[in-house]
Structures are given as structure tokens and as C-alpha cells.
């Protein structure tokens, strides 16, 4: 099993591992055997920062999970939509798949779409966005980012793509824009950088 990365889904955390003041819904989620999602935060050795997802945006909880408790790990790129769906977000996933596959980079759905595909739990609704992760180990030009964004903006719902660089995550929409610096999110927090692939700048 590889080291957990942001947006990976992990199974194996139990209600007993929750803080004593955790809400009842969080206990129910873990008791039902649902996964947690890896988030960006620093942890002590042997632990990983994760988030629990309940019903609606109000039910979110950030906690830590022991690496030794992980029983299953699923990355976004392992998830793909199957068949037709009444939800615009899943329709969008099917429509953009050929465009993203043509990039030659690893990618996959995150957020509600990824969670529903992985668990079968119905969390999507008519206004759901499609969140995607695109792994970009090497720099993507801003012209290429604009081209990709243009090809995705004709989908039936809003699509938010995060580019995962070696230093952290940035929004495709920002990288395709005109601002000289963009917001890079990492385990150390968020900061504005000019080159999100420059590890020295991102660590400064």
C-alpha cells in the first residue's frame, strides 16, 4: 500500500478512534464502514490527516487516522463513472473523460462524485459540482491550462479541477488566469506562489 495522498479514500477507521467529543453522525458514518478522505495537514509519524463526510456541507469533521488502521486505499484515478445518470455531475464526468484521457496524465473525480462512485452512498444532487484531480508532476504551461479549461467549461455543471504538483495543489482555473501568483495548498498551509512546481519557492 502506497503512502496516502490528498483526496485518497481510506477504509479501516472505527468509531473508537474518534475524539470523545465527535458528533453522533461521525460515529454513524464509521460504524457503517464508510471511508474517510485524506486532507492536507501535518501529522505525527504514523498518522494521516483525514476528513469524515456526513449529510450536507454542515457535516464535515477533520480528524487523524493511524496508518496501521488502513485496510483499503482508493485513489481518485481508480474511479470512473459507469452508465447513464440523472445527475449533471456524473453526466459531466462522462463527457470530459475523453478530454482528460487525451492529456496523458493521471486524473480522477474527488468530492461528492468520487465519494458516491466509491461507496454507492447517494450524496449528489441537482446542483452538485464536479471536482477533479489532475496529477501534474511536470509543469503545465498557462496556455495549456487555458486550453484545457476552455474544453471543460462546456459541461452540464461547474467543474473544478485541482492540479496536483509535487509541492501541493492549485486550481486549474487560477493557473489559467492572468494573476502572476496562484494559491498553492499543501500540508503546511496555503500560500501564493509564482511557480507551483518550484519546490524551493513553495518551501520558502
UniProtKB/Swiss-Prot annotation:
Keyword Transferase assigned to the entry: answer is yes
The family annotation for this protein states: Belongs to the MdcG family.
Q: Which GO terms describe its molecular function?
A: nucleotidyltransferase activity
Q: Which Pfam families match?
A: MdcG (PF10620), MdcG_N (PF20866)
**Reaction(s) the record says it catalyses:** apo-[malonate decarboxylase ACP] + 2'-(5''-triphospho-alpha-D-ribosyl)-3'-dephospho-CoA = holo-[malonate decarboxylase ACP] + diphosphate
Enzyme Commission number(s): 2.7.7.66
Which keywords describe this protein according to UniProt?
A: Nucleotidyltransferase, Transferase
Q: Which gene name does the record give?
A: mdcG
Which residues does UniProt mark as catalytic?
129, 131
Organism, as annotated:
Pseudomonas putida (strain W619)
Q: State the InterPro entries in the record.
A: Holo-ACP_synthase (IPR017557), MdcG_C (IPR049180), MdcG_N (IPR048903)
Q: What is this protein called?
A: Phosphoribosyl-dephospho-CoA transferase
Record keywords: Cell membrane included?
A: no
Give the protein's function.
Transfers 2'-(5-triphosphoribosyl)-3'-dephosphocoenzyme-A to the apo-[acyl-carrier-protein] of the malonate decarboxylase to yield holo-[acyl-carrier-protein].
Amino acid at each position: 500500500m502506497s503512502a496516502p495522498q490528498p483526496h485518497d479514500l481510506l477504509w479501516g477507521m472505527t468509531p473508537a478512534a474518534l475524539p470523545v467529543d465527535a458528533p453522533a453522525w461521525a460515529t454513524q458514518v464509521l460504524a457503517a464502514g464508510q471511508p474517510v478522505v485524506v486532507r492536507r495537514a501535518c501529522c505525527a509519524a504514523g498518522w494521516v490527516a483525514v476528513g469524515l463526510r456526513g449529510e450536507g456541507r454542515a457535516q464535515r469533521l477533520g480528524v487523524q487516522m493511524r496508518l496501521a488502521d488502513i485496510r483499503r486505499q482508493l485513489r481518485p484515478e481508480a474511479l470512473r463513472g459507469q452508465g447513464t445518470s440523472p445527475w449533471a455531475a456524473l453526466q459531466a464526468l462522462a463527457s470530459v473523460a475523453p478530454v482528460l484521457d487525451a492529456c496523458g496524465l493521471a486524473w480522477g473525480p474527488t468530492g461528492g462524485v468520487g465519494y458516491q462512485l466509491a461507496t454507492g452512498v447517494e450524496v449528489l444532487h441537482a446542483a452538485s459540482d464536479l471536482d477533479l484531480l489532475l496529477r501534474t508532476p511536470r509543469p503545465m504551461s498557462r496556455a495549456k491550462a487555458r486550453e484545457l479549461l476552455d474544453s471543460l467549461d462546456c459541461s452540464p455543471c461547474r467543474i473544478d479541477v485541482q492540479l496536483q504538483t509535487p509541492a501541493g495543489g492549485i486550481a486549474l482555473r487560477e493557473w489559467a488566469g492572468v494573476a502572476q501568483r496562484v494559491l498553492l495548498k499543501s500540508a503546511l498551509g496555503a500560500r501564493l506562489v509564482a511557480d507551483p512546481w518550484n519546490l524551493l519557492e513553495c518551501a520558502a
